[in-house]
């Protein structure tokens, strides 16, 4: 009746046989059809939150991922996990949460996929610890997986030049040494980060995005497209 034979897939434990009728009832409650339940379940995880621009576009990107999964014959199952953004956390007690968050991301993603017997995983992340966190989970799970970088932020314009958050950091130093007025610093901070996306510099997010391609978890040339672009 259906295209896919799930007898050897992990999701058989939650969708095949008379004894799985209760689980299937839950799926039908979420408007899945019998045909949907008979297809491979593909987890779509993002680290979306409103903590910083790094992650703010990820939920929208996930909807495109889900369309792709459906087109390819799978049934997408979206979920989110936490992230701690270094750009907000650093310089105070919050930075103690940063590295730990990487392992929480990996652990929570792994637990969700194992707990619900998903057959494959697509992960979308946008900041320093979330990229390696999702990639760690993919390696542990050993199921078909694809990593997608949320993309870098676009530069802003200030005094006729491209600027990024790096210039704001430097501006803080200039202000502290008396080389920039408070008014100029305020104008700079208002212009430096005009869009969604990860920090516009060769920091951990953009670096790990390159690594994701190099180790084969991301598709070639997928990391370079900025977050606001429709191609992303």
Q: Where are the model-predicted features located?
A:
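N-terminal amphipathic/basic leader segments beginning at the initiator methionine
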Residues: 1-36, 71
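Gly-rich Lys/Arg/Thr-decorated short loops/hinges at beta-loop-alpha junctions or inter-strand turns
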Residues: 3-11, 42-49, 82-96, 189-194, ...
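A short N-terminal beta->alpha junction/helix N-cap motif
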Residues: 10, 14, 32, 49-57, ...
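Long, structured ligand/cofactor-binding scaffold of large enzymes
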Residues: 35-149
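Active-site cavity-forming subdomains of large catalytic enzyme subunits
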Residues: 98-232
């Amino acid at each position: 009746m259906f295209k896919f034979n799930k007898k050897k897939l992990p999701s058989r434990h939650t969708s095949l046989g008379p004894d799985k009728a209760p689980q299937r009832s839950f799926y039908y409650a979420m408007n899945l059809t019998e045909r949907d339940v008979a297809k491979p379940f593909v987890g779509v995880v993002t680290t979306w939150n409103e903590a910083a621009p790094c992650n703010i576009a990820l939920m929208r990107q996930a909807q495109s991922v889900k369309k792709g999964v459906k087109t390819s014959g799978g049934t997408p199952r979206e979920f989110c996990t936490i992230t701690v953004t270094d750009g907000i956390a650093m310089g105070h007690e919050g930075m103690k949460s940063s590295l730990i968050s990487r392992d929480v991301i990996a652990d929570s993603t792994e637990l969700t996929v194992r707990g619900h017997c998903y057959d494959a995983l697509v992960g979308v992340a946008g900041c320093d610890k979330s990229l390696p966190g999702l990639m760690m989970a993919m390696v542990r799970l050993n199921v078909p997986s694809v990593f997608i970088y949320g993309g870098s932020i676009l530069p802003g314009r200030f005094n006729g030049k491209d600027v990024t958050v790096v210039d704001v950091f430097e501006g803080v130093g200039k202000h502290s040494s008396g080389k920039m007025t408070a008014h100029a610093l305020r104008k700079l901070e208002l212009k430096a980060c005009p869009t969604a996306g990860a920090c516009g510099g060769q920091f951990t997010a953009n670096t790990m995005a390159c690594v994701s391609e190099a180790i084969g978890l991301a598709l070639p040339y997928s990391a370079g497209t900025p977050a606001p672009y429709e191609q992303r």
